[in-house]
Amino acid sequence: MCDRAMTRRAVLGSLGGLGVMGTSGMTGTAQTAATDPAARRAELYALLGQVPPRDRPASGEKLGEASRDGYILETWRLDLNGVEPVPAYVARPRQASGRRPGVIFDHSHGGGYAIGKREFIEGRSYLQPTPYAKELTDLGYVAICIDHWVFGERSHTSEADMFKAMLWRGQVLWGMMVYDSLRATDLFLQRDDVDPARIATLGMSMGSTMAWWLAALDERIKVTVDINCLTDFQALLDRKALSLHGVYYYVPALLTHFTAAQINALIAPRAHLGLAGLRDKLTPVEGLDRIDRELQQVYAAHGHPERWSLLRYDVEHQETAEGRKAIVAFLQRFL
């Protein structure tokens, strides 16, 4: 793994050297895919573009740790994708022993390209005052947050430039983000203080979208909490509101294979809590209605209607105090 900071030119140039992962998920019949969750996951993964091989070696180097507000914060540099290092934080309870539940925290966008994983320890204006690193460690959990492509210490290249450079090479920015989340999960579950049978993922806005994509693709995720970005794609199209989401959000040909509800159905019957603002333009209410209706049917068919819940609040794009309490209660119940 490279020890020096990657330059914009070096990263853009090295993207073309990625290996292509062969998949068979899109070769089956539509009927088979519709009734076989494994086939549907393979189909969804295939839409992520030319990501590195899923089984390429991944590793991490611990750079240090410090005591912070009742927990221990570890700083890591991960080798996940073979293109550029991935900075990460891991927060663990100060007084804890044995294996603990683990949470993959997915940071938001909000135009804060320089922020990235710092949201985990510092919070954001649209989140409740207690940062999630403290909230989760106070619950006795171990949690990880990485800098995603074009954010935090990886903000050397603009979102638009990275999206276009990847597109030229058959890659998808969102696909590379999801890939990094999957590989970070691989490493996180190898920790001696993490119980691999008790893993959750949680995020706000872009982090919300990452949470439900990650859980849809990775059955090791037992609990999903998505805050304010359970967007129905057709509702967004109908409102002509595509510009409200960053370009990172758009995956070629996605709508010819999946609706948002169909992606989220791959999480069932695992526990899933969605939270939404009734005045949030990123999640049109009619789209929330559609997703909620379909997922209620899916979870009922699995015999676990209690594992799906969509809570709505009379706010715009923000987490509420009531929502934070509901999130904590949901994690305590299902994780």
Predicted regions and their residues:
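Cap/lid segment of the alpha/beta-hydrolase catalytic domain
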Residues: 108-179, 237-238
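C-terminal segment of N-terminal export signals and the immediately downstream linker at the start
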Residues: 5, 10, 25-39
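Short beta-strand element of the alpha/beta-hydrolase
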Residues: 99-108
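N-terminal cap/lid segment of alpha/beta-hydrolase-fold proteins
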Residues: 58-95
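Gly/Ser-rich "nucleophile elbow"/oxyanion-hole loop immediately N-terminal to the catalytic nucleophile
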Residues: 162-205
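Mobile cap/lid helix-loop segments that gate and shape the active-site cleft of serine hydrolases
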Residues: 223-264, 269, 282-292, 300-304
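C-terminal catalytic histidine-bearing segment of alpha/beta-hydrolase fold enzymes
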Residues: 293, 298-335
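N-terminal secretory signal peptides and thylakoid transit peptides that target proteins
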Residues: 2-19
